């Protein structure tokens, strides 16, 4: 399939006062290069020569009210254990079309593993309000693609953390990608016939597609040390889907808003370390009406820094850069991130964290991101034309806060990006290099994501090449097909 959704909204950074979106054909970045379908047969990619699975349309999901009232399951029932006939109608066609589909006992074990070991890794701070448990996991009972994606990441994560490899995760991933491609093909066919996007993507479809794409992106990070490129396909496809739906009124469900903001976190942090010409085009930003969300102001400012740094690089490449052209000073950056830090701490009140280690560690996480962002800004935007005392101060606090975390294991999902930045700031400090290496090894092992070992290898390469900057090395890696995504 060579197009996604046929038309894509171009939202020009989604800022107030942007020019109206333009509509035009869009190459599917997530499911085009990897798969192309001709009469239902994959002609390239993982599924070459295999036909598209034909899954019956799932039954209507329960009302949104029921979804909102869902709670974190103490024990996830298998489809056969659940008396709800809707669930069986989703499982039955999967069993018929997917050889080796897990038996009820295995499904129960995999869903419970997702509930207990993976859902908490997907959010800033795990709590009873975790939407991945409360809303996404129950949705899998009605959506076969999402069910396959969740079973895939759960099985792969279990395999990585227990050392028992199996073939099911990759096959489930491929089948889920195939079914998303099938849905995209159906929609684009209708668009070609003259139908508008809003009439072809209903809210339920938008939600399961976006949830599946995000789940599959995480799956790729568990599978190999070089999973960033594959994960990036899913991220770009999710970005395209969200931007396309911005032209409709089909993106207003609470779960879609949650998933959209999850994508914004992933998208913005990813863009800090990849450098392709389209890397910062139509990035998903925190929704303006969700400015009270944790880290939303921080992420918006961080992305501005990324965009400004790419503009500087382009001007320098053409010999037209003047330091006075930078839109902010280092003092402005410090003030802006300090303001964002305060906003994050205020927004965190909704979590109602008890006064224990989790609360103290969250405050440290905010500090960690604050100083990592300052160091990132000093390097990529100001090229360290900043007082050394400022750089050294943020570096010192960053390492101190990382070392002060009381319950590191519960914080690991938040650490890949700031630990990466810490790693770029210790090229001449062997003790700090050992600390960063241990942190990344712990992240990879405890989270069950093999990809982070690849990030560690990048940092070790950087430490041994003292004459290059981390951005230069990352560009070199990317040119050779190895994207660096420290998320």
Give the residues covered by each predicted segment.
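Charge-rich, intrinsically disordered regulatory segments
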Residues: 1-129, 169-170, 186-190, 461-486
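Short secondary-structure boundary/capping segments within folded domains
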Residues: 103-104, 137-145, 201, 475
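Hydrophobic/aromatic-rich effector regions of fungal transcription factors
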Residues: 114, 133-139, 149-162, 172-227, ...
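Charged/polar, low-hydrophobicity segments characteristic of intrinsically disordered regions
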Residues: 181-194, 245-262, 298-306, 347-350, ...
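Acidic/serine-rich, low-complexity amphipathic helices located in mid- to C-terminal regulatory regions
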Residues: 204, 212-311, 481-482, 487
């Amino acid at each position: 399939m060579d197009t996604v959704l046929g038309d894509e909204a171009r939202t020009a950074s989604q800022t107030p006062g942007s020019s109206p979106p333009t509509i035009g054909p869009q190459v599917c970045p997530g499911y085009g290069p990897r798969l192309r379908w001709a009469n239902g047969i994959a002609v390239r990619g993982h599924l070459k020569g295999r036909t598209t699975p034909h899954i019956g349309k799932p039954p209507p999901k329960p009302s949104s009210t029921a979804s909102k009232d869902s709670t974190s399951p103490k024990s996830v029932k298998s489809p056969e254990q659940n008396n709800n006939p809707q669930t069986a109608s989703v499982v039955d066609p999967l069993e018929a079309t997917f050889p080796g589909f897990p038996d009820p006992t295995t499904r129960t074990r995999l869903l419970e593993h997702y509930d207990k070991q993976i859902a908490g890794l997907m959010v800033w701070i795990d709590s009873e309000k975790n939407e991945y448990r409360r809303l996404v996991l129950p949705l899998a009972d009605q959506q076969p693609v999402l069910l396959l994606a969740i079973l895939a990441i759960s099985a792969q994560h279990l395999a990585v953390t227990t050392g028992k490899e199996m073939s099911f995760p990759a096959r489930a991933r491929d089948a889920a990608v195939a079914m998303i491609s099938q849905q995209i093909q159906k929609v684009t066919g209708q668009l070609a016939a003259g139908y508008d996007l809003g009439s072809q993507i209903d809210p339920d479809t938008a939600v399961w597609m976006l949830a599946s794409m995000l789940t599959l992106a995480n799956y790729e990070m568990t599978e190999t040390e070089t999973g960033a490129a594959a994960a990036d396909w899913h991220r770009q496809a999710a970005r395209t889907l969200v931007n396309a739906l911005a032209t409709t009124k089909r993106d207003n469900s609470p779960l879609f808003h949650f998933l959209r903001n999850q994508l914004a976190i992933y998208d913005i942090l990813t863009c800090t370390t990849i450098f392709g010409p389209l890397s910062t085009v139509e990035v998903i930003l925190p929704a303006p009406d969700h400015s009270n969300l944790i880290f939303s102001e921080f992420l918006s400012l961080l992305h501005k820094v990324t965009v400004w740094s790419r503009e500087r690089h382009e001007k320098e490449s053409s010999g037209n850069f003047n330091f006075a052209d930078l839109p902010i000073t280092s003092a402005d950056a410090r003030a802006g991130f300090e303001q964002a830090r305060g906003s994050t701490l205020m927004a965190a009140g909704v979590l109602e964290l008890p006064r224990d280690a989790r609360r103290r560690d969250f405050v440290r996480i905010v500090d960690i991101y604050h100083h990592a962002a300052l160091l990132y800004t000093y390097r990529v935007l100001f090229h360290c034309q900043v007082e050394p005392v400022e750089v050294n101060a943020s570096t010192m606090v960053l390492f101190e806060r990382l070392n002060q975390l009381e319950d590191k294991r519960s914080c690991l999902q938040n650490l890949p990006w700031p630990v990466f930045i810490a790693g770029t700031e210790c090229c001449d400090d062997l003790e700090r290099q050992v600390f960063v290496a241990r942190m990344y090894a712990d992240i990879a092992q405890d989270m069950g994501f093999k990809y982070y070992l690849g990030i560690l290898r990048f940092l070790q390469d950087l430490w041994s090449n003292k004459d290059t900057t981390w951005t230069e090395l990352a560009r070199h890696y990317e040119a050779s097909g190895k994207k660096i995504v420290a998320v």
